């Protein structure tokens, strides 16, 4: 009888210890979850289906756009544009590929939502452990669902994230999982929080930044401050290809920032997020963000980063349509490139 008592007592003790350990683990998990949600709640939220503009507002927008026009090129009619073949499958509509659209706004005083000045698709492929940054040129001529044909950046001004996502899906067959928007002025603050960004500068680039920010940079590798990185990202008049070089510089800065972040420890990363997230606007829920983070974090430090742009060299022509200077992409070639670089 005594032996049975001891065995029973031992079982109870083991059970108590096991339950205590389990309680500690569950409490820790709950604490992490609560902390994570508290961190995510620092972001600004917007409904993906932001209000669209009225017909009158759109007409005023188009008229203002024509008045600002300074480009040139052979004139063609809207009916001459070849929109390519039918799209059968969506790129990124799988568990191994996550497509997050990064939207940069250069909002002017009094504006609540401007044209998207920068659109960079961040594609994370868990299977190949790659991150691809794809810039979409703002003068790209596309079909905008419900609004006709215009520059791609107009879709954001007219219908926010949802319309921009629908535009990318209809024209390029890309499935967007979520959107992240940063105002360019906030972008400078983010760079400063990361301690600056390393960038190789040409002599003329350094001179431009110096003039723009009252700095004293020289050619070669430099650690740029937030204002200097923003100035660098906006350069478009030093090269013959203007806006193409500008988007290339933006991808360079973003790639360098990714490299800095992925080399940071968890404690440092959490500290950065605490400071950065209040500067970010998204249409994703906390659950969606944490779900994507759980998928990406294990491979993030080992991921290789590459970049590209749409349209690519040799896959577009610069023309005038209805008084607008636009880029008309070879849709079939462009979709083929995206299939090769973004598909799992």
Please identify what each model-predicted range represents.
Residues 2-20, 28-344:
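Non-catalytic, solvent-exposed segments at the cell envelope interface
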């Amino acid at each position: 009888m005594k032996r049975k008592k001891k065995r029973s007592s031992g079982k109870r003790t083991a059970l108590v210890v096991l339950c205590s350990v389990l309680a500690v683990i569950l409490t820790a998990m709950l604490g992490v979850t609560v902390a994570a949600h508290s961190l995510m709640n620092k972001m600004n939220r917007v409904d993906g289906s932001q209000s669209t503009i009225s017909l009158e507002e759109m007409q005023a927008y188009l008229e203002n756009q024509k008045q600002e026009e300074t480009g040139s090129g052979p004139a063609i009619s809207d009916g001459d544009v070849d929109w390519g073949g039918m799209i059968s499958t969506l790129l990124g509509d799988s568990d191994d590929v996550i497509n997050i659209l990064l939207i940069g706004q250069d909002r002017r005083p009094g504006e609540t939502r401007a044209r998207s000045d920068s659109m960079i698709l961040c594609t994370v492929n868990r299977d190949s452990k790659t991150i691809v940054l794809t810039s979409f040129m703002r003068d790209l001529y596309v079909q905008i669902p419900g609004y006709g044909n215009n520059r791609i950046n107009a879709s954001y001004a007219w219908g926010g994230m949802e319309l921009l996502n629908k535009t990318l899906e209809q024209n390029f067959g890309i499935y967007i999982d979520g959107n992240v928007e940063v105002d360019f002025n906030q972008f400078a603050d983010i760079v400063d929080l990361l301690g600056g960004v390393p960038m190789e500068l040409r002599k003329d680039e350094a001179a431009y930044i110096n003039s723009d920010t009252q700095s004293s940079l020289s050619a070669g590798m430099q650690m740029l401050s937030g204002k200097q990185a923003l100035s660098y990202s906006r350069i478009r008049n030093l090269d013959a290809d203007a806006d193409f070089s500008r988007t290339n510089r933006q991808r360079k800065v973003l790639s360098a920032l990714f490299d800095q972040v992925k080399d940071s420890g968890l404690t440092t990363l959490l500290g950065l997020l605490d400071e950065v997230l209040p500067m970010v606007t998204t249409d994703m829920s906390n659950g969606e963000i944490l779900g994507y983070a759980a998928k990406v974090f294990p491979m993030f430090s080992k991921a290789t980063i590459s970049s590209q742009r749409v349209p690519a060299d040799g896959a577009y022509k610069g023309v005038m349509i209805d008084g607008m200077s636009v880029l008309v992409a070879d849709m079939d070639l462009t979709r083929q490139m995206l299939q090769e670089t973004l598909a799992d």
